[in-house]
Amino acid sequence: MALRGFCSADGSDPLWDWNVTWYTSNPDFTKCFQNTVLVWVPCFYLWACFPFYFLYLSRHDRGYIQMTLLNKTKTALGFLLWIVCWADLFYSFWERSRGIFLAPVFLVSPTLLGITMLLATFLIQLERRKGVQSSGIMLTFWLVALLCALAILRSKIMTALKEDVQVDLFRDMTFYVYFSLVLIQLVLSCFSDRSPLFSETIHDPNPCPESSASFLSRITFWWITGLIVRGYRQPLEGSDLWSLNKEDTSEQVVPVLVKNWKKECAKTRKQPVKVVYSSKDPAQPKDSSKVDANEEVEALIVKSPQKEWNPSLFKVLYKTFGPYFLMSFFFKAIHDLMMFSGPEILKLLINFVNDTKAPDWQGYFYTALLFVAACLQTLVLHQYFHICFVSGMRIKTAVIGAVYRKALVITNAARKSSTVGEIVNLMSVDAQRFMDLATYINMIWSAPLQVILALYLLWRNLGPPILAGVAVMVLMVPVNAVMAMKTKTYQVAHMKSKDNRIKLMNEILNGIKVLKLYAWELAFKDKVLAIRQEELKVLKKSAYLAAVGTFTWVCTPFLVALCTFAVYVTIDKNNVLDAQKAFVSLALFNILRFPLNILPMVISSIVQASVSLKRLRIFLSHEELEPDSIERRPVKDGGDTNSITVRNATFTWARSDPPTLNGITFSIPEGALVAVVGQVGCGKSSLLSALLAEMDKVEGHVALKGSVAYVPQQAWIQNDSLQENILFGCQLEEPYYRSVIQACALLPDLEILPSGDRTEIGEKGVNLSGGQKQRVSLARAVYCNADIYLFDDPLSAVDAHVGKHIFENVIGPKGMLKNKTRILVTHSMSYLPQVDVIIVMSGGKISEMGSYQELLARDGAFAEFLRTYASAEQEQDPEDNGVTGVSGPGKEAKQMENGMLVTDSAGKQLQRQLSSSSSYSGDVSRQHNSTAELQKDGAKKEETWKLMEADKAQTGQVKLSVYWDYMKAIGLFISFLSIFLFICNHVAALASNYWLSLWTDDPIVNGTQEHTKVRLSVYGALGISQGIAVFGYSMAVSIGGILASRCLHVDLLHSILRSPMSFFERTPSGNLVNRFSKELDTVDSMIPEVIKMFMGSLFNVIGACIVILLATPIAAIIIPPLGLIYFFVQRFYVASSRQLKRLESVSRSPVYSHFNETLLGVSVIRAFEEQERFIHQSDLKVDENQKAYYPSIVANRWLAVRLECVGNCIVLFAALFAVISRHSLSAGLVGLSVSYSLQVTTYLNWLVRMSSEMETNIVAVERLKEYSETEKEAPWQIQETAPPSNWPQVGRVEFRNYCLRYREDLDFVLRHINVTINGGEKVGIVGRTGAGKSSLTLGLFRINESAEGEIIIDGINIARIGLHDLRFKITIIPQDPVLFSGSLRMNLDPFSQYSDEEVWTSLELAHLKGFVSALPDKLDHECAEGGENLSVGQRQLVCLARALLRKTKILVLDEATAAVDLETDDLIQSTIRTQFEDCTVLTIAHRLNTIMDYTRVIVLDKGEIQEYGAPSDLLQQRGLFYNMARDAGLV
């Protein structure tokens, strides 16, 4: 050899000698090999890594690490190693100078090693300067150097022990020093250095230890052990969780996706970049078909007419996350190659057992090789998984962030096509699909690679017969393809049904109070169940398909093996199936099983993700609002004195619709107060929306000068403290804040709220009255100190005296905003004389414009309307003249001059009380208000008072009762049948493999085996029986899962609908939506699959242990201890894993709640230009959720590494005992034992993963059961006490000593109410805010049950009858008109009790017949979500039509005509008088004018009746009622 002269002077030392290294009982390497290869390998490794590592470090500077003792020691040791290496070199030169001839290797190797040690020392310092705390490159270098040195050390020790060998003392001593220093360097490299200077983790109160963990800690996931130990000792809480790594936060991830999406959109459309997330330009070109886009969202699967216009979201995701994700390719490729080391070593091991002359050390060497290969495979595999899961987490974060940002800027038309339910599904289900895909997508190339490698090795082992197996696999490809296509179809249908169900559930939860008041729960329950039935039909088809899929996937590897063995033994009698061929092939078939099984799952996952990808792309491509359509000028712009200029502008809500506003032209000077008036639906609110750029400008010019504040018609309140709602992101300036509170009449409210302005308002302002919500909304606008104020009827929901106070102190000529430009949409005529300009709207156009006096002098439509209406009212109600004390036209004129129109018609001035407590939800606050007033000493104002309950995480182990509940939901027969079929399957599998081992041990006679046909037939029969059992259990589990899912959903839905209102008032809707979306999806899709995999893994592990014990009984010594370690590690892990899953579920709800809240208030957020703040809040909530998710995925890896090490130990001992017992074992048993042990690692890993998955997913059942077992309201029907069908006939209502409280720990909000209302009487209920007005109504409907006393209606105590029996017989027209998506007819008559004629009659009486008749679909007109395609006034009229249709003896009105114009108001009042003439009418009135002609009035204060009598009598008493009338300007 060429190296002989290089290694020794006489050429006697070869590089390699088989007789020295292999064919010997005492193996060693040659001296030449030791001095060259073992020295050069670490050097070549470091020099090969250096250029790439240097480049990486130069681009990734994490900061500067100060010199530490660790760093100084490593550097010093590096120099010492250099000195030691070159000491050898100088010694060689010294020897040469003495005439001793040395081979060149003694000069080259020390030189190379010395330079390498200098390089290593340089890298140690470079890493320090670049902030690397622990280096994998250097640790690997020292490990390789040590392993190479270890082989040399063994050789030197063995040489030294020989007596007749001469020892080179100096070189031996330097080597021992070198070995010791390398060992110390390796140990030091296992530790991590301190954090770099200026590192962000220094300022983080709870940083993730991963960034400062050592390389060894990172690859073994040791750094999370502390958290797992803490979780084992006590349940983990949110405060225990670490901050996210910076690269995983929304702040880092989302902007990159946003930027790449913009580029892709621009590139695809071949036009300038359209900003998708920053509300600059529309996402689609103006000439694109918006209708097509909407249809696509609805159908989800229709093809785009112009494919070239569709940007590729997949490309964007790949560009954003690809670079990091590509590392997983590297790890996966290494793992796939290493997978085949097991069967190859198994072949060597079987050959070793068969070769009785082979030295024992070879068996131990193979055993060690098998163990090391398995351990390396474990570490590589879980680095791969870690990268995949982190990538998935980042994708989910980015998708949620992108969807949230898009939702802030899409047009109103796009909002209608993408409902809240669909958008929530994009954030929950679809984002989860991307996460799942990240884990599996590499299998697209990895599975075929594994199949090719396995087939290659099988060909080497068995030859051409393997083609029979290939044929079977090829036949299965079209079967899998058909199933994948079918799966996609079912997936699309399933997602559509799920969207519809979530959308409807969202509406039900938002309008639950209305459902309860109308007793409509059953109708809507049936609607949900009908959608759910369709969903379950699709799920059932998917389950059958999955069962067929499982059957083919499990049977395919066996069929491949059977066909291959059958062809092998039949084509040639001399082909003997010995242990090596059978079990190496079987090991390869087992490897083949995974890619063949996983590929259909991957295809399914890709199919699901492609559906989600399309849905997401359609949503992100929606049209956006164009804020640039309105010119925004700074206040300092002195060129124009007008604050608002609109010239010939036309606006529409959707480009496909006709314009809503036509030819609008007006200018408003700075500081002017402008009123906008007109009938319902004439475009008043649309005008404000147009100024806010909420509408699509078709033509014209709009310019605004300065900042804008907006008070919407329906007050939007956040689930936050009252103070935060007012500040709305601004800094607190105490004096100004106090003046705003006072001007908005909130001071009295702060005094009675439990924690003052720190009181948490609750979701949608649940514990504030309508008036309080509107005043908070107003205060928010005032506090922001804008230049232009847009008020959409802000005084509608407040009492007359409060309205007067607000107008005088805030909006009016002398108010806080007197120098600001104000536009006030109003129906109240009383304020018009004080405004500068009045804009009169009619049919989407400005019909008149001018000051109050100018419009009267012009004698146009406006003046005619005022005169006609006033005189008509006077003629209608002459008795009111006596009340007010003045009569005739003179009075009207005088009041007009004074700016107050206070005749009875003025009393019925149109106010919109839309915001007043979402269908009475605000009355909880009235309870708290009066309670606090009665118990002022009880309120602790230091702490924020909270009404809403956060989603709580359960702690501890999931109770067995949860599993039992799930089994009962499946059905006990199906449950036990599934277990039986699982056992049958695995018994058949064990029997077939044992039979194969017996077959391989059959004696060979004349070059062939006897009984081959019998062996083959039995082997085939066992395989077929296994397949039948697989199909059986798969069907049983799938059907059982659907039965359980149906049962749990019905229980949850029924329970939620049966819960009292107090439950909804304290439970955020996000929690409930989460249950019906994510948790139910887990029960639908995840749990059945997890059960199948858990049961399979459990029986596989048991089977493997049985086989190993049968083959090598000595393994009984080691398997129990390993089992204990396994059990301990698993218990250790599950305690933390379970709690992390719960924390993740709990932190997910606020993401949805915040998102829902944002969608409801998106116009306010945009008006105040607070998008960035809300985006930041959303990002923080998503990060908070990922803070719990990230440790859970790392904990999974932590567990898997440790358990696979236990599995690797089983492999080690199975092989070791086989080597020890090789003389007493047959090759067949060794093959069976080791091939099963090779699978144990995978089985153990899957078993623990599936057991933890089972426990973490069963949490979904626990969380569904949690809300299925909440408190319930009284029964809906009680047969024994059901009232007669014609009850109540008279309508007499008696309150006898009636007391009401909202919770046991609170005081009464109604105290000892004793009053009798005779049938047919019209009774008004008045009182200040918090007096208990609405509480009385809630008591009447038994929304809250009485604490003491009773209510008697026509002689029947209402507490003794069913709630529906009561609520069907009483009708309410609520303050807030709530409509549901569906037909108009359904909104009027969900039970279809009435004929079309009766419905049309009710519409006619409600003055809606003309409007509905003009609609294309008439009664089948589809109402949008929340009735958004009807004006607020029209929605209120629909509520009136409901009441007219029901025509019950008792009618409750809560300012029912607040949102209609004066003319319609008059018509409605007369309808109520005529149609409900013989009915008992109770009216809660903020405005006393509406009840002046009533029979009697109840005056409430602090929950007690203070006055009761006819209005005229109460005025004469000059008490509370008189004072209220005086404040309202009635006396």
From Swiss-Prot:
Q: Where in the cell is it found?
A: Cell membrane; Basolateral cell membrane
Segments forming domain ABC transporter:
644-868, 1293-1527
Give residue ranges for domain ABC transmembrane type-1. Answer: 325-608, 975-1256
By sequence similarity, the record places it as follows: Belongs to the ABC transporter superfamily. ABCC family. Conjugate transporter (TC 3.A.1.208) subfamily.
Record: residues binding ATP 2: 1327-1334
Q: Which residues lie on this side of the membrane: Cytoplasmic?
A: 55-74, 122-133, 194-316, 385-440, 486-547, 612-967, 1047-1089, 1133-1203, 1248-1531
Which reaction is this enzyme known to catalyze?
Answer: ATP + H2O + xenobioticSide 1 = ADP + phosphate + xenobioticSide 2; an S-substituted glutathione(in) + ATP + H2O = an S-substituted glutathione(out) + ADP + phosphate + H(+); sphing-4-enine 1-phosphate(in) + ATP + H2O = sphing-4-enine 1-phosphate(out) + ADP + phosphate + H(+); leukotriene C4(in) + ATP + H2O = leukotriene C4(out) + ADP + phosphate + H(+)
Residue positions annotated to bind ATP 1 are 678-685
> What are the annotated GO cellular component locations?
basolateral plasma membrane
| Record protein name field | Multidrug resistance-associated protein 1
Q: Which residues cross the membrane?
A: 34-54, 75-95, 101-121, 134-154, 173-193, 317-337, 364-384, 441-461, 465-485, 548-568, 591-611, 968-988, 1026-1046, 1090-1110, 1112-1132, 1204-1224, 1227-1247
Residues with the modification Phosphoserine, per the entry, are 289, 905, 915, 930
Give its E.C. classification number.
Answer: 7.6.2.2, 7.6.2.3
**Phosphotyrosine: which positions carry it?**
277
User: Where is it mostly found?
Assistant: membrane
Gene Ontology molecular function, alphabetical: ABC-type glutathione S-conjugate transporter activity; ABC-type transporter activity; ABC-type xenobiotic transporter activity; ATP binding; ATP hydrolysis activity; glutathione transmembrane transporter activity; xenobiotic transmembrane transporter activity
Q: Which residues form a coiled coil?
A: none
